[in-house]
Amino acid sequence: MSDLLCSAKLGATTLALLLSAASLSAQASVTPDRTRLIFNESDKSISVTLRNNDPKLPYLAQSWIEDEKGNKISSPLTVLPPVQRIDSMMNGQVKVQGMPDINKLPADRESLFYFNVREIPPKSNKANTLQIALQTRIKLFWRPKSLENVSMKNPWQY
């Protein structure tokens, strides 16, 4: 009888742990429209659409660029506007702009940067509330003109 009782307790404990772990998942409210960005040298800028998927609340979206080491930069690429309000279920747009220093990037290979978006939730009216600002980080590739028209028939040859 005690083995049956232990087995039932173990099953109930396992179920409780699984249910609590499932409730800990987080989903960003402000999301970019793609998973990576390619900035061609021939482009002056590229636009990224940010979507607020929250059905009720507006969010602030803070955007910036980092280099391959994770350092925040403002040149040779920058984001405009760096902060914007996006109402619920609406889109916002940011522009990744090339600066004059962009000519100093290598012309024989792509350069890696990271595009970041942090969602900032509105202040809660309730006392003792924990609010979390989630951040999305996606790769941003700067592609020089020498690689823009490379055929993707045999990409391993380049």
What is the predicted function of each stretch?
Residues 1-14:
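Bacterial N-terminal signal peptides that target proteins for export
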Residues 101-147, 151:
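Terminal connector regions
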Residues 27-51, 149-158:
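Beta-sheet-dominated interaction scaffolds and their linkers
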Residues 20-25:
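N-terminal signal peptide c-region/cleavage motif recognized by signal peptidases
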Residues 71-103:
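Intrinsically disordered, low-complexity Pro/Gly/Ser/Thr-rich segments with frequent PxxP/GP/PP motifs
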Residues 43-45, 58, 91, 110-112, ...:
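Extracytoplasmic
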Residues 55-71:
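Short acidic, flexible loop segments centered on an aromatic residue
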Residues 46-52, 96, 113-118:
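Buried hydrophobic-core signal for structured, non-transmembrane domains
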